[in-house]
Amino acid sequence: MYNKVIMIGRLTAKPEMVKTPTDKSVTRATVAVNRRFKGSNGEREADFINVVMWGRLAETLASYGTKGSLISIDGELRTRKYEKDGQTHYITEVLASSFQLLESRAQRAMRENNVSGDLSDLVLEEEELPF
């Protein structure tokens, strides 16, 4: 049997890392992943998928991930349960084994500042180089 998740989406908030009582780093995040088809209103719908990361992976995402960051995540689908007020609740989430931020700092800055255009505008032509 095989349990593998690969997704690309955007972080819905700045990831926050916490330490467990045994001093392990854990980061939880939600990733908005657009569906491949449009909904009845003509717009793309998104799924909001909970992700959990442990250790150095958690620390790295907490340091470099920001709200809106385009991210690729590999991992496994996990289900856990807990009791609250006599009710059993189930949570399905992705346990990440790796991730990659898919935007450069310049692309992220353009998105955050709502700058239109593409990165080719930022490249100097040979004639403009001082050497």
UniProtKB/Swiss-Prot annotation:
Classification via Gene3D superfamilies: Nucleic acid-binding proteins
All residue ranges annotated as the SSB domain in the record: 1-103
GO BP: DNA recombination; DNA repair; DNA replication
GO MF assignments: single-stranded DNA binding
Keyword DNA-binding applies: yes
Quaternary structure, from the entry: Homotetramer.
NCBIfam families membership: PRK07274.1 (NF005579), ssb (TIGR00621)
Protein name: Single-stranded DNA-binding protein 2
Native source organism of the sequence: Streptococcus agalactiae serotype V (strain ATCC BAA-611 / 2603 V/R)
